[in-house]
Amino acid sequence: MEIKASQVKELRELSGVGMMECKKALVEVEGDIEKALDLLRSNSALKAEKKSARVAADGVIKVHVSENYATMVEINSETDFAAKDDSFIEFAKNIEERLVSKKYLDVEDLKKDVEEDRQKLVQSIGENIQVRRLATQEFDSPKKVGTYLHSDNKLAAMVLLKEENDELGRDIAMHISASAPLSINEDGVDKEVLERETNIFESQAKESGKDENIMQKMVEGKIKRFLKEVTLLSQDFIKDPDISISKLLENSDNEVISFERFKVGEGIEVSSKDFAEEVAEQLNKDG
Protein backbone atom coordinates (compact mmCIF):
# COMPACT_ATOMS: atom_id res chain seq x y z
CA MET A 1 0.00 0.00 0.00
CA GLU A 2 1.28 3.45 -0.91
CA ILE A 3 1.68 5.81 2.05
CA LYS A 4 1.15 9.49 1.22
CA ALA A 5 3.46 12.22 2.50
CA SER A 6 0.42 13.98 3.99
CA GLN A 7 -0.31 10.90 6.14
CA VAL A 8 3.27 10.80 7.42
CA LYS A 9 3.12 14.53 8.15
CA GLU A 10 -0.16 14.17 10.07
CA LEU A 11 1.14 11.26 12.14
CA ARG A 12 4.36 13.11 12.91
CA GLU A 13 2.39 16.13 14.16
CA LEU A 14 0.23 13.91 16.36
CA SER A 15 3.05 11.79 17.78
CA GLY A 16 6.17 13.96 17.68
CA VAL A 17 8.08 10.94 16.33
CA GLY A 18 10.53 11.05 13.39
CA MET A 19 9.36 10.75 9.77
CA MET A 20 10.85 7.30 9.16
CA GLU A 21 9.29 5.85 12.32
CA CYS A 22 5.92 7.31 11.28
CA LYS A 23 6.16 5.85 7.79
CA LYS A 24 7.10 2.39 9.14
CA ALA A 25 4.13 2.46 11.50
CA LEU A 26 1.73 3.48 8.71
CA VAL A 27 3.01 0.72 6.44
CA GLU A 28 2.54 -1.83 9.23
CA VAL A 29 -1.11 -0.85 9.82
CA GLU A 30 -1.92 -0.19 6.15
CA GLY A 31 -2.31 3.57 6.45
CA ASP A 32 -4.68 3.72 9.44
CA ILE A 33 -3.66 6.87 11.36
CA GLU A 34 -5.31 5.85 14.65
CA LYS A 35 -3.76 2.37 14.63
CA ALA A 36 -0.38 3.83 13.67
CA LEU A 37 -0.61 6.27 16.57
CA ASP A 38 -1.41 3.41 18.98
CA LEU A 39 1.53 1.44 17.59
CA LEU A 40 3.91 4.36 18.05
CA ARG A 41 2.66 4.91 21.60
CA SER A 42 3.27 1.25 22.36
CA ASN A 43 6.77 1.45 20.89
CA SER A 44 7.41 4.67 22.81
CA ALA A 45 6.48 2.96 26.07
CA LEU A 46 8.82 0.05 25.34
CA LYS A 47 11.69 2.35 24.38
CA ALA A 48 11.05 4.57 27.39
CA GLU A 49 11.14 1.53 29.65
CA LYS A 50 14.47 0.40 28.17
CA LYS A 51 15.98 3.87 28.48
CA SER A 52 14.75 4.26 32.07
CA ALA A 53 17.69 2.11 33.21
CA ARG A 54 20.11 4.77 31.97
CA VAL A 55 21.25 7.47 34.38
CA ALA A 56 19.49 10.82 33.99
CA ALA A 57 21.42 13.28 36.16
CA ASP A 58 21.10 16.52 34.19
CA GLY A 59 17.99 18.60 33.55
CA VAL A 60 16.14 21.53 35.10
CA ILE A 61 14.14 22.63 38.13
CA LYS A 62 10.83 24.47 37.93
CA VAL A 63 9.30 26.56 40.72
CA HIS A 64 5.72 27.81 41.07
CA VAL A 65 4.14 29.94 43.82
CA SER A 66 0.36 30.34 44.12
CA GLU A 67 -1.82 32.02 46.74
CA ASN A 68 -1.61 29.11 49.18
CA TYR A 69 1.16 26.75 48.07
CA ALA A 70 4.58 26.67 46.43
CA THR A 71 6.02 23.76 44.46
CA MET A 72 9.46 22.79 43.17
CA VAL A 73 9.98 19.94 40.72
CA GLU A 74 13.15 18.40 39.26
CA ILE A 75 12.97 17.10 35.69
CA ASN A 76 15.96 15.05 34.52
CA SER A 77 17.62 14.25 31.22
CA GLU A 78 20.87 12.39 30.58
CA THR A 79 22.70 15.40 29.16
CA ASP A 80 22.62 19.18 29.30
CA PHE A 81 22.31 19.12 25.51
CA ALA A 82 18.94 17.35 25.78
CA ALA A 83 17.83 19.73 28.54
CA LYS A 84 18.27 22.59 26.04
CA ASP A 85 16.29 20.83 23.31
CA ASP A 86 13.08 22.67 22.35
CA SER A 87 10.91 19.61 22.98
CA PHE A 88 12.39 19.13 26.48
CA ILE A 89 11.87 22.83 27.23
CA GLU A 90 8.24 22.49 26.10
CA PHE A 91 7.79 19.38 28.30
CA ALA A 92 9.15 21.27 31.32
CA LYS A 93 6.95 24.26 30.51
CA ASN A 94 3.86 22.03 30.37
CA ILE A 95 4.74 20.61 33.79
CA GLU A 96 5.10 24.13 35.13
CA GLU A 97 1.63 24.94 33.78
CA ARG A 98 0.24 21.87 35.54
CA LEU A 99 1.65 23.17 38.83
CA VAL A 100 -0.41 26.33 38.29
CA SER A 101 -3.69 24.48 37.80
CA LYS A 102 -3.24 21.66 40.32
CA LYS A 103 -1.63 21.28 43.74
CA TYR A 104 0.58 18.19 43.69
CA LEU A 105 1.64 16.75 47.04
CA ASP A 106 3.13 13.54 45.64
CA VAL A 107 5.54 13.26 42.71
CA GLU A 108 3.91 9.97 41.68
CA ASP A 109 0.66 11.81 40.91
CA LEU A 110 2.53 14.23 38.67
CA LYS A 111 4.38 11.37 36.98
CA LYS A 112 1.08 9.67 36.10
CA ASP A 113 -0.31 12.86 34.60
CA VAL A 114 2.69 13.43 32.31
CA GLU A 115 3.68 9.84 31.51
CA GLU A 116 2.33 9.81 27.96
CA ASP A 117 4.12 13.08 27.15
CA ARG A 118 7.31 11.74 28.78
CA GLN A 119 7.26 8.63 26.61
CA LYS A 120 6.84 10.74 23.48
CA LEU A 121 9.78 12.89 24.55
CA VAL A 122 11.99 9.83 25.14
CA GLN A 123 11.07 8.63 21.66
CA SER A 124 11.83 12.03 20.16
CA ILE A 125 15.07 12.90 22.00
CA GLY A 126 16.44 9.40 22.49
CA GLU A 127 17.42 9.95 26.13
CA ASN A 128 16.05 8.82 29.46
CA ILE A 129 13.75 11.57 30.76
CA GLN A 130 12.44 11.45 34.34
CA VAL A 131 10.35 13.56 36.69
CA ARG A 132 12.52 12.85 39.71
CA ARG A 133 11.15 14.66 42.76
CA LEU A 134 8.72 17.28 43.94
CA ALA A 135 8.33 19.40 47.06
CA THR A 136 5.20 21.36 47.97
CA GLN A 137 4.85 23.84 50.81
CA GLU A 138 1.40 25.01 51.91
CA PHE A 139 0.78 28.37 53.64
CA ASP A 140 -1.90 30.97 54.36
CA SER A 141 -0.06 33.89 52.72
CA PRO A 142 2.35 33.92 49.76
CA LYS A 143 4.37 36.59 51.59
CA LYS A 144 5.42 33.93 54.12
CA VAL A 145 7.29 31.95 51.49
CA GLY A 146 10.54 32.81 49.77
CA THR A 147 11.79 31.08 46.63
CA TYR A 148 14.95 31.27 44.58
CA LEU A 149 15.74 29.71 41.21
CA HIS A 150 19.24 30.12 39.78
CA SER A 151 19.49 31.51 36.25
CA ASP A 152 20.57 28.13 34.83
CA ASN A 153 17.44 26.43 36.32
CA LYS A 154 19.61 23.80 38.02
CA LEU A 155 19.54 25.05 41.62
CA ALA A 156 16.54 26.18 43.66
CA ALA A 157 15.23 26.59 47.19
CA MET A 158 12.10 27.62 49.02
CA VAL A 159 11.64 28.60 52.65
CA LEU A 160 8.55 29.09 54.80
CA LEU A 161 8.64 31.87 57.42
CA LYS A 162 6.44 32.29 60.47
CA GLU A 163 5.60 35.92 59.62
CA GLU A 164 5.09 37.71 56.30
CA ASN A 165 8.30 39.07 54.80
CA ASP A 166 8.76 38.06 51.16
CA GLU A 167 12.03 40.00 50.75
CA LEU A 168 13.59 38.23 53.74
CA GLY A 169 12.22 34.94 52.44
CA ARG A 170 13.89 35.42 49.06
CA ASP A 171 17.21 36.35 50.69
CA ILE A 172 17.15 33.24 52.87
CA ALA A 173 16.09 31.04 49.93
CA MET A 174 19.07 32.38 47.96
CA HIS A 175 21.32 31.68 50.95
CA ILE A 176 19.99 28.11 51.23
CA SER A 177 20.66 27.52 47.53
CA ALA A 178 24.28 28.62 47.87
CA SER A 179 25.10 27.24 51.34
CA ALA A 180 23.24 23.89 51.24
CA PRO A 181 22.29 23.50 54.93
CA LEU A 182 21.16 20.03 55.99
CA SER A 183 18.65 21.23 58.58
CA ILE A 184 17.32 24.32 60.36
CA ASN A 185 19.15 23.57 63.62
CA GLU A 186 21.29 20.88 65.28
CA ASP A 187 18.25 18.84 66.35
CA GLY A 188 17.36 18.30 62.71
CA VAL A 189 20.70 16.85 61.59
CA ASP A 190 20.31 13.21 60.61
CA LYS A 191 21.79 10.94 63.30
CA GLU A 192 23.47 8.70 60.72
CA VAL A 193 25.16 11.71 59.11
CA LEU A 194 26.41 12.94 62.49
CA GLU A 195 27.62 9.46 63.44
CA ARG A 196 29.50 9.08 60.15
CA GLU A 197 31.22 12.45 60.55
CA THR A 198 32.07 11.67 64.19
CA ASN A 199 33.71 8.39 63.16
CA ILE A 200 35.80 10.24 60.56
CA PHE A 201 36.87 12.86 63.11
CA GLU A 202 37.79 10.16 65.64
CA SER A 203 39.93 8.35 63.06
CA GLN A 204 41.69 11.62 62.21
CA ALA A 205 42.30 12.32 65.91
CA LYS A 206 43.82 8.88 66.47
CA GLU A 207 46.24 9.46 63.61
CA SER A 208 47.54 12.54 65.42
CA GLY A 209 49.01 10.33 68.19
CA LYS A 210 48.05 12.82 70.91
CA ASP A 211 46.77 12.08 74.43
CA GLU A 212 43.21 10.77 74.85
CA ASN A 213 41.85 13.96 76.42
CA ILE A 214 43.38 16.12 73.66
CA MET A 215 41.96 13.81 70.99
CA GLN A 216 38.53 14.10 72.61
CA LYS A 217 38.72 17.90 72.48
CA MET A 218 39.82 17.73 68.84
CA VAL A 219 36.78 15.61 67.97
CA GLU A 220 34.40 17.86 69.90
CA GLY A 221 35.81 20.93 68.15
CA LYS A 222 35.39 19.39 64.71
CA ILE A 223 31.83 18.29 65.46
CA LYS A 224 31.00 21.81 66.61
CA ARG A 225 32.43 23.31 63.40
CA PHE A 226 30.61 20.73 61.29
CA LEU A 227 27.25 21.53 62.91
CA LYS A 228 27.83 25.25 62.39
CA GLU A 229 28.52 24.65 58.71
CA VAL A 230 25.46 22.46 58.01
CA THR A 231 22.71 24.04 60.14
CA LEU A 232 20.87 27.00 58.65
CA LEU A 233 20.55 29.10 61.81
CA SER A 234 24.27 28.81 62.58
CA GLN A 235 25.50 29.67 59.08
CA ASP A 236 26.86 33.12 58.26
CA PHE A 237 24.43 35.00 56.01
CA ILE A 238 25.80 34.89 52.47
CA LYS A 239 24.92 38.56 51.75
CA ASP A 240 26.42 39.75 55.06
CA PRO A 241 28.89 37.26 56.62
CA ASP A 242 29.13 39.41 59.76
CA ILE A 243 25.77 38.09 60.96
CA SER A 244 24.31 34.60 61.20
CA ILE A 245 20.94 33.55 59.79
CA SER A 246 19.77 33.25 63.38
CA LYS A 247 20.66 36.91 64.02
CA LEU A 248 19.12 37.97 60.70
CA LEU A 249 15.82 36.37 61.73
CA GLU A 250 16.04 37.81 65.23
CA ASN A 251 16.50 41.31 63.78
CA SER A 252 13.37 40.78 61.68
CA ASP A 253 11.39 39.16 64.51
CA ASN A 254 10.80 36.10 62.36
CA GLU A 255 11.41 32.32 62.27
CA VAL A 256 12.08 29.65 59.67
CA ILE A 257 9.40 26.96 59.76
CA SER A 258 10.80 24.73 57.00
CA PHE A 259 12.85 24.75 53.81
CA GLU A 260 13.61 22.67 50.72
CA ARG A 261 16.61 22.78 48.40
CA PHE A 262 16.98 21.05 45.03
CA LYS A 263 20.14 20.78 42.96
CA VAL A 264 19.82 18.96 39.63
CA GLY A 265 21.33 15.48 39.80
CA GLU A 266 22.28 15.74 43.47
CA GLY A 267 22.54 12.28 45.01
CA ILE A 268 22.44 10.48 41.65
CA GLU A 269 25.41 8.20 41.06
CA VAL A 270 26.93 8.88 37.66
CA SER A 271 29.36 6.58 35.86
CA SER A 272 32.94 7.86 35.84
CA LYS A 273 33.56 6.52 32.32
CA ASP A 274 34.70 9.14 29.87
CA PHE A 275 33.28 9.49 26.36
CA ALA A 276 36.12 7.55 24.71
CA GLU A 277 35.56 4.58 27.01
CA GLU A 278 31.84 4.56 26.25
CA VAL A 279 32.47 4.64 22.50
CA ALA A 280 35.03 1.82 22.75
CA GLU A 281 32.64 -0.26 24.83
CA GLN A 282 29.84 0.26 22.31
CA LEU A 283 32.11 -0.69 19.39
CA ASN A 284 33.07 -3.91 21.18
CA LYS A 285 29.39 -4.74 21.67
CA ASP A 286 28.61 -4.03 18.03
CA GLY A 287 31.57 -6.16 16.99
Question: Could you tell me what each predicted segment is?
Answer:
Residues 2-287:
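N-terminal assembly/interaction segments in proteins that build large macromolecular machines
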